[in-house]
Amino acid sequence: MAASRIASANALGPNRVSFARIKEPLEVPNLLALQTESFDWLLGNERWRARVEAARKAGRKDIPEQSGLEEIFEEISPIEDFSGTMSLSFRDHRFEPPKYSEEECKDKDMTYSAPMFVTAEFINNDTGEIKSQTVFMGDFPLMTAKGTFIINGTERVVVSQLVRSPGVYFDSQMDKSSDKELYGCKIIPSRGAWLEFEIDKRDFVGVRIDRKRKQAVTILLKALGWTTDQILERFGEYESIRATLEKDPTAGTDDALLDIYRKLRPGEPPTKEAAQALLENLYFNPKRYDLAKVGRYKINKKLGLEIDITQGTLTEEDIVATVDYLVRLHAGEKELVRPHGTFPIEVDDIDHFGNRRLRTVGELIQNQVRLGLARMERVVRERMTTQDVEAITPQTLINIRPVVASIREFFGTSQLSQFMDQTNPLAGLTHKRRLSALGPGGLSRERAGFEVRDVHPSHYGRMCPIETPEGPNIGLIGSLAAYARVNSFGFIETPYRKVVDGRITDEVVYLTADEEDRYVIAQANTPVNPDGTFAESQVLARRKGGEFESVAAEEVHYMDISPRQMVSVATAMIPFLEHDDANRALMGSNMQRQAVPLLRAEAPLVGTGMEYRAATDAGDVILAEKSGVVEDVTADYITVLADDGTRKTYRVHKFRRTNQGTCFNQRPIVEEGQRVEEGQVLADGPSTEAGEMALGKNLLVAYMSWEGHNYEDAIVLSQRLVEEDILSSIHIEEHEVDARETKLGPEEITREIPNVSEEVLADLDERGIIRIGAEVVDGDILVGKVTPKGETELTPEERLLRAIFGEKAREVRDTSLKVPHGESGKVIGVRVFSREEGDELPPGVNELVRVYVAQKRKITDGDKLAGRHGNKGVIAKILPKEDMPFLEDGTPVDIVLNPLGVPGRMNIGQIMEMHLGWLAKHGWKVEGDDAEWKRRLRDIGAHEAPPNSKVATPVFDGAREDEISGLLSCVLPDQDGDILVNKFGKAKLYDGRTGEPFKEPVAVGYAYFLKLHHLVDDKIHARSTGPYSMITQQPLGGKAQFGGQRFGEMEVWALEAYGAAYALQELLTIKSDDINGRVKVYEAIVKGENIPEPGIPESFKVLIKEMQSLCLNVEVLSRDGMSIEMRDSEEDVFRAAEELGIDLGRREPSSVEEV
């Protein structure tokens, strides 16, 4: 076989026959860099320093000089007291090694963090005395190598936030009355007061200071020290400024300052000094106002200024230049000429990615630490004034509680710190690459309009246009494109190949969205000659605003780096994406993240070449850190002897529970004595095979209807998949119980449980905890626990007997941990923590027991399956394999799909995948080169493949239609020499029940199917009696509360329409909230009597009480006009309940744990 190209450019990945034609000059960058690099910058660790050094050598200009923590400590230093006699400053933060490992933290519910120390210097300016001390600043949560944080034992991810960049923005809107375009402008800082300018329909230029009332802009200019003559000299040619000056009542600077003060602080006596200080504090005080470097950069760029990038406050020049730009825009000018260049005058598009930036993890945590330090600063100031100057040391001034609290608050409660989605490795990877416009300082779901959510041309290569949730968050949450990176200002850049004089070079340049607008960019699949020139004189290229047209080859400045540049990782794993409708591709991207890891992972026959990188970067496989030889392999450990003589032992995790209850299990794939290279996969994780992402299974699929059982997206499945555990998965649930200190004494974990038979306790050990390996079903005891009961008042006789015969055994009740409803499985692990053993437990807890129960779930009807093209469905019927339609050689198909699901949904990719899957399974060989497609395949080395080959068809650069239809006639025969599928990809199928052939040939092939996390076992639910709501006494709702089924308004209408009066009455009373009726009916059923008349529903009594609380006199009258008394309890109910052994005095359980 000709050496087929390897799709995964990484030589360590498995071989795939690739249909790609385009050579990519750049590898996909590390997919977790968005998280890890940002956090490295925050800490300023060695990795970050090395990266900065490398960038400096490469000549990059936008590199940050300081780490995130250095920036804040420098910002806050020095903290001076009110008189300026003492100051406290901070420098040189450092971290000690973490106290506990990641594993210990997960195990013991702790936070994975390292102690942070800072050198604090206290200076007494009067005496010149300096006291220096290293101060502990609290434990700082650390990021794991996988880009996650471990907070209180659970893995969390901090999502990057998309926000509007600080800077100056010009906008325009049409005035309805005068049909004039009205221009406005906002200067938005990173923190501080906004400054807004606007021109109204009478050409009056107004300014709003800090969102207050509008004033003439000339008042602000005069307050800054300008005279009327200076204003006229600079802006005299513009009608708008002259009109504004006429309406301006103020005379000079003092007058203008007082006028501003009156508008901002109405009711306070205006003085010149107060007004000056107010304006100073709003815009010119670095403590109160900060544009941040990015804001300064944007203002300089927009207004053509050359102010130093470290200037964080506004300057007079900024305000003048902004007014200048605004009046020029209003006057209809198109260009602004400055000494160092010409700048366009135009309004801004706020949805453009040049105006939206990312706040990554580092910056989000930095802002939180800044908040904590600002709170600490107040404490330090107060302590400086109250403590004795001689006795002051940095340690006595500093209170670290606000800093620690604000960091903890961020990780625990912020909208952007999220419980990690760990269903499978792709879900975790995508979660870490997520971009959210929600969160503090961002948008809110309700306010976000259509424009913000829509795809924008500037998203190209930066944010995926496909992957976003369905529902209320659509367009507000996105995913970073595969090649994108974030620069030091927080803008997303995407790489392009430089084109010089019509020749493509291998130089790669990263461009931000606003730089890209200036260039003409060709697409990645433009035909190219071997010498790097364009094959055609006219090239299809993009210009500003996403418009594309045919341009001369010499006009092109850059070229896309790869066809998959515009999509995210999950979307790049959909083969034949180019043949799918975008709505279905969106569902396909999202559903890959919901695939549960199966018992045996199987990589797709038809992939895209992205599988290897996605799996290795997600961090759930084990990679060799150095090249060497494998010395020792067991299920739990792999030891590698590196070439430099060092040994490294890798821990292999077995059957762990993920956040979503799926199974995290790693398996070694290397053998003793095997040579391994650096970066090679040593052990597979969940949903990976040989280091490739393997989320589902390759199944033999037929597109045909089957007795209507696959109507409306339902799926018919073969029993083989159940018997052979092909779609079985393991799910692990964690059950926890703690023994607390109560007012009546401590709770106890024990085997001695009152009123429980010995066989129920058979699987418990002597401590009362279930043994590992026990099979349990719902209701079984996992951990025996008793709680002291309140002593009742004793009668004198009892007291006498107690005094004679000594203390009776104290009363306890059974509060054991039982398996919840509908759950079962095998106990695979038990963890016991106790205060006596020295474990750290929450206050009031003496002992904590965790039990892990695993269950193997076979595929069953009601489970949800999906392909990668948004083709999802629910299993309606599982047929015995002998009844499934079968091929001519007797092979029954695995899955029967409805062909009507394809044309309307326009996801034809699934059909292409199915045909190519058949080809990959059986192999092919192309003879001759008498056709264009044959020559193309020969050029890329894909003209032959043995049976069971894996193929790669990259996004937008994959196998073409003519190649697939051509290859279907070149497929290799099977062992019997038969070719079962004709050149159209269709096979003759026979009905498994009768053996008769179906009338028409049917499309048959191999497709990749995922089992989604929506499993019927988690959804099915039934209740006989259970908890009731406290007030209305109606059953609770939902499976989690063990609730009932709501019989709603529309269902009532249905019964009313049938006139089913008695059924309706029962539903409204005894089946719901007629308390007395419930008990009486139970009694009647037990005694075999007729069902008595229903009583009055409790919610009716609640309604009356509610009306009475509004001071309305409400009475209930009987038919004969007598007032009915609503008594709360009836004696015979209590009597009946007592006879039936129902304890009405006990508290009803209010949650499923207690049921």
UniProtKB/Swiss-Prot annotation:
Disulfide bonds: none
Reactions this protein catalyses: RNA(n) + a ribonucleoside 5'-triphosphate = RNA(n+1) + diphosphate
Gene3D superfamilies named in the record: 2.40.50.100, 2.40.50.150, 3.90.1100.10, DNA-directed RNA polymerase, beta subunit, external 1 domain, DNA-directed RNA polymerase, subunit 2, domain 6, RNA polymerase alpha subunit dimerisation domain, RNA polymerase Rpb2, domain 2
InterPro entries linked to this entry: DNA-dir_RNA_pol_bsu_ext_1_sf, DNA-dir_RNA_pol_bsu_external_1, DNA-dir_RNA_pol_su2, DNA-dir_RNAP_su2_dom, DNA-dir_RNAP_su2_hyb_sf, RNA_pol_bsu_bac, RNA_pol_bsu_CS, RNA_pol_bsu_protrusion
A Pfam family that the UniProt record links to this protein: RNA_pol_Rpb2_7
GO cellular component: DNA-directed RNA polymerase complex
Gene Ontology MF annotations: DNA binding; DNA-directed RNA polymerase activity; ribonucleoside binding
GO biological process, one term: DNA-templated transcription
EC code: 2.7.7.6
Keywords: DNA-directed RNA polymerase, Nucleotidyltransferase, Transcription, Transferase
HAMAP family listed in its UniProt record: RNApol_bact_RpoB
Function: DNA-dependent RNA polymerase catalyzes the transcription of DNA into RNA using the four ribonucleoside triphosphates as substrates.
Subunit structure: The RNAP catalytic core consists of 2 alpha, 1 beta, 1 beta' and 1 omega subunit. When a sigma factor is associated with the core the holoenzyme is formed, which can initiate transcription.
Family of this protein: Belongs to the RNA polymerase beta chain family.
NCBIfam families recorded: PRK00405.1, rpoB
Identification of the protein by name: DNA-directed RNA polymerase subunit beta
